[in-house]
Amino acid sequence: MSKVQEVLSKLAGKAKAARAALKGDAGVLATLEGEHAEVAMLMKAVLDEGHDDHDPEALECRRELFHKIRIALLAHAKSEEQEFYGVLELRPATRDRATHSEIEHREIEHLIRRLDHMAESDLGWMPTFASLQMKVEAHVRDEETLLFDEAKLVLDKHELREIDERYKAARRRYQELLEGDSHTTHDSGHASV
């Protein structure tokens, strides 16, 4: 079993436990919280496993985990903007918060693009990745506390379930598109945004 497979196997169990621990939120909110938890675990694994800039196995682990994180974050952001923020921007009570969240997505995408253009062995790669992790954590914290609370005030459970169905379909499409684009790469080996 490769180092990456070993890490992913451990994370699969933790992700399942995290999803089971989520209680109370309906529809798209629960889905988004579950995805946030999974990406957080993958990001932690990069920081835990990928520190040696000269070890080929550590670099391969870093490369594969980042590829998964990259696809997860980009598919999540595009789908969330399209299906969740799009609805919230139509409501005066949630418009500003949803717009702010989209701005944070652009900042996250910028950091992903910076990492795309760096070799995983570059000394600046891990500090840039750590910046990405901090930006994602801050975004998730704001979203799950502030935006989700506001969304619960303007959307009923039926609407949250409908948005969830559309979100999941959009995410599958974006994920397939991003995975297909992996064959069209930059010098670093990552797909373009």
Question: Residues of each region from the PLM?
Answer:
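Small-residue-biased structural context
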Residues: 1-193
